[in-house]
Amino acid sequence: MSLVKLANTCAHLQNCSKVRVALTSIPYTKLQLQFAYNLYQQGFLSSLQKGSTMGPDKDFVEVTPDNISTRRLWVGLKYRDNKPVLSSCKLISKPNSRIHLPMEDMKKLCSGVTIRNIKPLQPGELILVRAHNNIMDINEAISKKLDGEVLCRVK
């Protein structure tokens, strides 16, 4: 998994939400799909659709090695009281210094303790973790008793 691509996606979504774009696209990869799906599940995004470079698909199109370069994920951004729901998206693990935490440290992080210079989880925030090549919310990783790499914080 490339943290550089995740950083680019975070910056893109953050920039689009600041200029009040309703619909934007990100590259179609497993990483981006899992990342966007978690944001959608947690209520930061209004919609998530597969599509091409021209826009979201009206009919189902299977992704194959021949058309993968033209496939995109179309993401609908959410706004509340004319303010973006997704206001900040920042990497915690960097490409040159990845941060892996055991489940016990993740529990402490969720309960208000600073761990390895990572500020505790605040209300309305989401910390995404990669465990066993899946991206999930930190609370989901704790409930499944998994250790993992702390990827990013979304506010």
UniProtKB/Swiss-Prot annotation:
**Subunit:** Component of the mitochondrial small ribosomal subunit (mt-SSU). Mature yeast 74S mitochondrial ribosomes consist of a small (37S) and a large (54S) subunit. The 37S small subunit contains a 15S ribosomal RNA (15S mt-rRNA) and 34 different proteins. The 54S large subunit contains a 21S rRNA (21S mt-rRNA) and 46 different proteins.
GO BP terms in the entry? mitochondrial translation
| InterPro entries with a match to the protein in the record | Ribosomal_uS8, Ribosomal_uS8_sf
What job does the chain carry out?
Answer: Component of the mitochondrial ribosome (mitoribosome), a dedicated translation machinery responsible for the synthesis of mitochondrial genome-encoded proteins, including at least some of the essential transmembrane subunits of the mitochondrial respiratory chain. The mitoribosomes are attached to the mitochondrial inner membrane and translation products are cotranslationally integrated into the membrane.
Intracellular or extracellular location(s): Mitochondrion
**Can you name this protein?**
Small ribosomal subunit protein uS8m
What's the name of its gene? MRPS8
Say if the entry is tagged with keyword Ribonucleoprotein.
yes
Molecular function per GO: structural constituent of ribosome
The family annotation for this protein states: Belongs to the universal ribosomal protein uS8 family.
Q: Which organism is it from?
A: Saccharomyces cerevisiae (strain ATCC 204508 / S288c)
Q: What cellular-component terms does GO give this entry?
A: mitochondrial inner membrane; mitochondrial small ribosomal subunit; mitochondrion
Give the keywords, sorted: Mitochondrion, Ribonucleoprotein, Ribosomal protein
Main location as per UniProt: mitochondrion
- Cite the Pfam families for this sequence: Ribosomal_S8
